[in-house]
């Protein structure tokens, strides 16, 4: 029944959006504005009431803590589009289970998220559960609809990726939209199918004094777990078997096992700006547009006046002489008629006798040339004043951001192999015996209040400054041995500040510090910073960028506490200390980018899994334990990107080298190469 509802809803959506779909070729300009190129001829309305529809879209991202906006580039059907649906990433940098929609992990350590999430089960699915900072808000000149379907394979092993986006603006300040994503991978091996649904809605209001962004998403992820194939020789040495196997015929460790994730997210940030208004000159494009509007208005007024004169002549039974009318209108602006006299009294004799040359209150105009020059200056000043606009300059902002996340994870299994798990802690709840129904819930609410002194409101304000306070409330539910649920609540209060400079062309920097005051995160410290210098070099810009952070943070709740049918732990872990220093050198002219990073981690937390393998290739005695490495781990990463282009030929290369001082704890790929 659910499947029928989904199909019906999809058909209804397609039917509703088809009338507004346009057959256009799209492109974006240097201002990140998406503009359809309509070069084909279109039949016009026979009534002559056609209106030119404005085209274009602007997108941006927002900071998850403060709601600061940053211009972004619109996604287009251009660079690397053919790889955009791959779970492996654009350049194959992720390890996956081979199927669309499976869990994944980035092989490049410096490209992984810096901090552990509160709900670790969704981290391997970051292509569905995206961070707020990656989302593109929209401002469109006219409604935008985009529907995309990528499909491959057949009914047995096929994959489908469907995406539908609609965005619209009520006016130039208020915009909204929605997006629907559906990923379905049947899998190439037994019990490997995946299914992901995601629905997103957003809205934004960008006024001079008040600004707000709202983002809502609800996700459902369902993955079939097979535990891997029973013997790697089916792949590595198929010749040792007397019969051949298709991939979906190779025996797997588990069957009828599902991992389900349901999560909802609400993000809302708004601010009130206090500042002043000032007159600034319009841009060249705005001046051209205003001149065109003024000329059009004048022309329309003249046409209306002529039409009114024509109607009046018709009512009076007279013939309308258009040439005489036009001559009369031109005469109105040709100056004073010949023989015109100046009316008024003659100046008083005492005033006439006054030496005007010695009058400091009057402007001396010597000759006709000087008078003409003065009149020209006055006319130019009057014209220039028309091309200034009022701009509101914010000085101080009062910011509030709230974020609410709700999660549920269910692991449901039937026909679990005998002795597969080492321990069993209880046999109660929804499923018993050889069946498993593990469930955990979590919700998290975070409020942040900030006061900002903004950058650039005058020539002395070279940087922006913010002070903020955040309060976290986290709720968790874990099963008990009696079949019920045990509830946990964690509170955390933190304060911090930010110093940043984003305007200008040569130097930019950003530094944020946050310290935990109370609750489970008391004593935590997070310092993040980056700086970039842009140097003109060989007709282009050489950018040198530095990034660094120091994080002392509490390990995620699920590293410290977890209850399930066959897994159970309650640990008191030390805070993890992670330091990174990274430098980046970029030169667009040679299409070169070099990154070098050094990491040091103390009290690194990870999961350790152990099991035995029988002669038949089955697993027994499976156990998972959270571990913490008290010593330090040093990591080195060096990455070179070098791209080449010759006419229509394009060759992109990325080479990465990594080294870990303790591979038994933090194992990394030593080298990784990708080329397109």
Residue ranges and their predicted role:
Residues 216, 252-314, 319, 368-672, ...:
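Exposed, low-structure sequence patches enriched in small/polar residues
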Residues 1-27:
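Bacterial Sec-dependent N-terminal signal peptides
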Residues 4-5, 9-10, 249-251, 321, ...:
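Terminal non-domain segments
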Residues 7-8, 15, 358, 364, ...:
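Intrinsically disordered, low-complexity segments
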Residues 23-267, 271-323, 327-346, 351, ...:
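Membrane-proximal, glycine/serine-rich, low-complexity loop/turn segments characteristic
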């Amino acid at each position: 029944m659910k499947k029928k509802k989904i199909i019906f809803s999809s058909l209804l959506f397609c039917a509703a959006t088809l009338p507004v779909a346009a057959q256009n070729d799209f492109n974006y300009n240097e201002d990140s504005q998406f503009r359809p190129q309509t070069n084909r001829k279109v039949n016009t309305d026979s009534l002559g009431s056609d209106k030119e529809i404005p085209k274009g879209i602007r997108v941006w991202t927002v900071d998850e803590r403060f709601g600061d906006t940053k211009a972004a580039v619109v996604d287009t059907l251009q660079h690397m589009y053919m790889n955009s649906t791959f779970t492996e990433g654009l350049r194959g940098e992720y390890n996956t289970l081979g199927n669309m929609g499976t869990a994944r992990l980035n092989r490049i350590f410096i490209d992984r998220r810096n901090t552990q999430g509160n709900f670790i089960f969704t981290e391997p699915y970051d292509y569905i559960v995206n961070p707020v900072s990656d989302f593109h808000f929209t401002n469109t000149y006219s409604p935008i609809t985009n529907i995309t379907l990528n499909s491959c394979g057949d009914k047995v092993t096929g994959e489908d990726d469907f995406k539908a986006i609609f965005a619209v603006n009520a006016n130039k300040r208020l915009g909204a939209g929605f997006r629907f994503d559906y990923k379905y991978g049947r899998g190439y091996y037994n019990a490997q199918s995946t299914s992901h649904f995601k629905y997103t809605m957003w809205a934004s209001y960008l006024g001079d004094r008040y600004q707000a962004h709202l983002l809502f998403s609800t996700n459902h992820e369902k993955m079939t777990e097979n535990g891997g194939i029973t013997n790697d020789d089916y792949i590595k040495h198929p010749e040792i078997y007397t019969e051949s196997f298709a991939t979906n015929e190779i025996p797997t460790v588990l069957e009828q096992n599902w991992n389900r994730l349901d999560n909802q997210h609400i993000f809302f940030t708004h601010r009130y700006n206090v500042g002043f208004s000032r007159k600034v000159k319009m841009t060249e494009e705005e001046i051209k547009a205003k001149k065109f509007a003024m000329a059009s208005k004048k022309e329309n007024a003249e046409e209306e006046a002529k039409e009114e004169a024509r109607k009046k002549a018709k009512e009076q039974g007279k013939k309308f002489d258009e040439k005489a009318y036009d001559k009369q209108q031109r005469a109105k602006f040709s100056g004073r008629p010949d023989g015109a006299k100046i009316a008024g009294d003659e100046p008083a004799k005492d005033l006439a006798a006054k030496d005007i040359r010695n009058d400091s209150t009057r402007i001396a105009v010597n000759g006709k040339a000087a008078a003409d020059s003065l009149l020209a200056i006055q006319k130019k000043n009057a014209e220039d004043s028309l091309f200034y606009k009022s701009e509101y300059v914010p000085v101080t902002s009062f910011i509030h951001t709230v974020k609410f996340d709700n999660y549920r994870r269910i692991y449901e299994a039937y026909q679990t192999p005998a002795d597969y798990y080492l321990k069993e802690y209880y046999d109660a709840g929804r499923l018993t015996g050889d069946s498993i129904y593990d469930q955990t819930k979590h919700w998290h609410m975070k409020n942040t209040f900030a006061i900002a002194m903004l950058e650039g409101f005058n020539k002395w304000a070279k940087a922006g400054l913010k002070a903020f306070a955040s309060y976290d409330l986290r709720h968790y539910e874990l099963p008990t041995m009696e079949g019920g649920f045990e509830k946990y609540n964690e509170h955390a209060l933190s304060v911090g500040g930010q110093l940043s400079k984003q305007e200008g062309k040569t130097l930019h920097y950003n530094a944020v510090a946050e310290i935990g005051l109370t609750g489970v995160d008391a004593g935590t410290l997070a310092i993040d910073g980056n700086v970039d210098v842009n140097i003109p070099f060989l007709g282009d810009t050489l950018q040198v960028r530095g990034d660094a952070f120091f994080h002392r943070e509490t390990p995620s709740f699920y590293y410290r506490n977890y209850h399930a049918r066959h897994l159970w732990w309650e640990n008191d872990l030390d805070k993890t200390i992670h330091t990174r220093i990274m430098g980046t050198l970029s030169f667009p002219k040679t299409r070169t980018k070099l990154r070098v990073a050094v990491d040091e981690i103390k009290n690194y937390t990870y999961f350790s899994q152990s099991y035995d393998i029988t002669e038949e290739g089955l697993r027994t005695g499976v156990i998972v334990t959270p571990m913490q490495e008290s010593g330090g781990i040093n990591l080195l990463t060096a990455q070179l990107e070098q791209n080449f282009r010759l006419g229509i030929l394009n060759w992109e290369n990325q080479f990465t080298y990594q080294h870990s001082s303790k591979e038994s704890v933090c194992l990394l790929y030593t080298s990784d190469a990708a080329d397109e």
